[in-house]
Regions:
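DNA major-groove recognition helix of helix-turn-helix/homeodomain DNA-binding modules
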Residues: 54-66
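Short glycine/serine/threonine/alanine-rich loop segments
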Residues: 25, 36, 65
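Ser/Thr-centric signal marking residues that sit
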Residues: 26, 40, 52
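Short basic helix-loop element that most often maps to the first helix and adjoining turn
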Residues: 14-31, 58
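N-terminal flexible/basic segments that precede or flank functional cores
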Residues: 1-11, 46, 61
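Alpha-helix N-cap/N′ positions at the starts of helices
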Residues: 11-12, 36
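Recognition helix of helix-turn-helix/homeodomain-like DNA-binding domains
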Residues: 35-49
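Helix-turn-helix/winged-helix DNA-binding modules
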Residues: 22, 48-51
Length: 66
């Protein structure tokens, strides 16, 4: 059975930014906690598609979104 999954990437990124700020993490602090570089986190928050799925999941899991 084929499953179509649609992801609102922009909405997910905006929610991640909101959670980071609500938890009072700087980008640098969240990057360390998630195990990614600050430039990677910055790319994620800017919605750039060059980030790997693995790194996106690290960030989302750290924020409780995955």
């Amino acid at each position: 059975m084929e499953r179509n999954i649609r992801l609102d990437w922009e909405g997910l990124v905006q929610e991640a930014i909101k959670r980071r700020k609500d938890q009072k993490f700087t980008q640098e602090e969240l990057a360390v906690l998630a195990g990614v570089s600050k430039p990677t986190l910055n790319s994620f928050e800017q919605g750039k598609t060059t980030i790997t799925l693995a790194n996106a999941l690290k960030i989302l899991r750290t924020l409780g979104l995955a």
